[in-house]
Each structure stands twice: as C-alpha cells, then as structure tokens.
Amino acid sequence: MMRIALFLLTNLAVMVVFGLVLSLTGIQSSSMTGLLIMALLFGFGGSIVSLMMSKWMALKSVGGEVIEQPRNETERWLMHTVAQQAQQAGIAMPQVAIYHAPDINAFATGARRDASLVAVSTGLLQNMSRDEAEAVIAHEISHIANGDMVTMTLIQGVVNTFVIFISRVIAQIAAGFLGGNREDEGESSNGNPLIYFAVATVLELVFGILASIITMWFSRHREFHADAGSARLVGREKMIAALQRLKTSYEPQEASSMMAFCINGKAKSMSELFMTHPPLDKRIEALRSGEYLK
C-alpha cells in the first residue's frame, strides 16, 4: 500500500509540474508534438539526472567510503585487483569504495566507462576467498566495460517516455469522450480534468508495471553477460564458485533502488519477471553451458 500511495503522490506531483510547464511554455497538451516533447523531457530527464549523480547517490545510499590511500593489506589487494582487471578490460581505473554490510555484495556505477565506481561490502571481503572476490570484482568491471549503466538509462528513458505519452493520449481521448470536449467554451481540450487525471493515473500504473517487466528483463540479461565477462577475465570456475558462495549469503540489505547495480539481488519476488537478477542456479548453469561465452 505504501508503494501505491507513493506512486500516486509522485504521479500527482509530476502531473502538476507537467501542467505548469505546459502553461509556461504555451504548449497545448492536446498537441501530439507538444505532448511528445514533454514526455521525452520527463521520460529521459529523471533517468539522465540519476545517471549523472549515480556515484554520489550510491555512496550515500550504502554509506560507502572511497579508498584514497590503502590503509591495510586488504585494501591494497582490492585496489591492485581492480586496477589489473580494469587494464585487462580496457577501461580507466574506477574509484574503489568499501561499505559496511553483512551480506556478500558489490556494485558498479557511473555515468561513463572512464569515470566509474566499484564498491564492495565488508561482508564480501570477510566471507569470500580471494579467488571468489576476484570473480565478483571482474563481474562489476564487466558491467562497466559493457556500458550497462548508460544502456539501462536509455532503456529506462524510452519506457518512461512511452508510459507518459501513451497514458496521456488515451486519458485525453477518454476525458474528451466521457466528459465532453469544451474547447469551444474556452476550456482545455483535454475534456473533464478529473476523468483525465484518473485515467492517466491508472494507465501510468498499468503501463508502468508492463514497462518494469521490460527493464527487469534487460537487467537479468546483462547479469548473464557480466558473469560471462568475469569468466573471461578470471576464469569460469572462479565465477561459478563466487555464485555458489552467494547462495550462502545473507539476504541483501541494500536499498531497492540499488538492487539492479549489485551482483547479488533479492531472491524473493512474486515472479521472476520482476527480478533484477536471474536465480543463482540459472546463472551457474549458463556459465557451465557456456551459453553467453560464445
């Protein structure tokens, strides 16, 4: 219920801002061109801002600390491993951070391949062997080398635009049909504003769920490729061993907004369709079969 309430409040805020911008710019919401322009701005705007601020937001979310100078042998090993793998993958040295969490996890983020961040949990450093940890780091390096963060932003922007545009087009038609078109009376050609808002809200919820299935599919798909990238960098057996170790880990404690960036996603979900990560057994089987190594 809380998520639905937050969605409705967010949608209300977006529609208010949306309406204000349309009014200030003089764009008629009944104009398909104007509506598409605003849908593109709102659809891509949030995704691009999130991407540009991703390192700062990620570090704040988990309370991570960037290693400026290694203070002990573990940090020296971590910095050396990241530097070595980044060179192998042909990318610039990412920033390296450690955050306190009991679960075995790590993530990579950043707006560009050559301005990225790799962060690992204390649980990973304490509970994984060096070979297993190397494989996890290689998985994150592969995400960066593959440009997954930018691709996810583009996909999210496209589906956001689709949701905003289609929802409002249908809402506009419904409001005009059910509430009557009052443009001749000097009022908005959107028809009854209450019907418009109600229909747009419901459709955004429905289309938003469908859109999340698309983004979650891509998120799972890129995990298979990052696993394969890790196997190429450090060896298939090391990556398989790392995934097997993840099966014994605590349930991830990272915020839901961070799950798509972590190597270990939450296992519990109503359906695999809404999972950011494939089940660990499927990832292990994909490595053993070499499906994504071809």
From Swiss-Prot:
EC number(s) of the enzyme?
Answer: 3.4.24.-
- Positions binding Zn(2+) in this chain are H139, H143, E223
Q: How does this chain sit within the bilayer?
A: Multi-pass membrane protein
Q: Name one Pfam family in it.
A: Peptidase_M48
Required co-factors: Zn(2+)
Please name the Gene3D superfamilies in this protein's record.
Metalloproteases ('zincins'), catalytic domain
Q: How is the cofactor bound?
A: Binds 1 zinc ion per subunit.
**What top-level branch of life does the organism fall under?**
Bacteria
* Location, primary (coarse class): membrane
Gene Ontology molecular functions: metalloendopeptidase activity; zinc ion binding
Any one Gene Ontology BP term: proteolysis
Q: Which UniProt keywords apply?
A: Cell inner membrane, Cell membrane, Hydrolase, Membrane, Metal-binding, Metalloprotease, Protease, Transmembrane, Transmembrane helix, Zinc
Q: Name one GO cellular component term.
A: plasma membrane
- Transmembrane stretches, start-end: 4-24, 34-52, 158-178, 194-214
Compartments, record wording? Cell inner membrane
Q: Where is the active site?
A: E140
The family database entries (InterPro entries) matched by this protein are listed as: HtpX_protease (IPR050083), Pept_M48_protease_HtpX (IPR022919), Peptidase_M48 (IPR001915)
Task: Report the sequence similarity comment from the record.
Answer: Belongs to the peptidase M48B family.
Identify this protein by name: Protease HtpX
| Source organism of this protein record | Klebsiella pneumoniae (strain 342)
